């Protein structure tokens, strides 16, 4: 059986796909908008 190799780093995840990072760019804001429209509980990480 293979091991799960993905550890996941909270800081890196926030820096790449956090809310404030999304709000910086036009396309990021579009992501937030579409997720709001869809009714997502979590808009960003």
From Swiss-Prot:
One of its GO terms (cellular component) is ribonucleoprotein complex. Residues 1-24 are annotated as: Disordered. Keywords: Ribonucleoprotein, Ribosomal protein. GO terms for biological process: translation. The keyword Glycoprotein does not apply. InterPro entries: Ribosomal_bL34 (IPR000271), Ribosomal_bL34_CS (IPR020939). Pfam families: Ribosomal_L34 (PF00468). It comes from the Bacteria. One of its GO terms (molecular function) is structural constituent of ribosome. Residues 10-24 have a biased composition (Basic residues). HAMAP family: Ribosomal_bL34 (MF_00391). Belongs to the bacterial ribosomal protein bL34 family. This is Large ribosomal subunit protein bL34. The lineage of its organism: Bacteria, Bacillati, Cyanobacteriota, Cyanophyceae, Synechococcales.
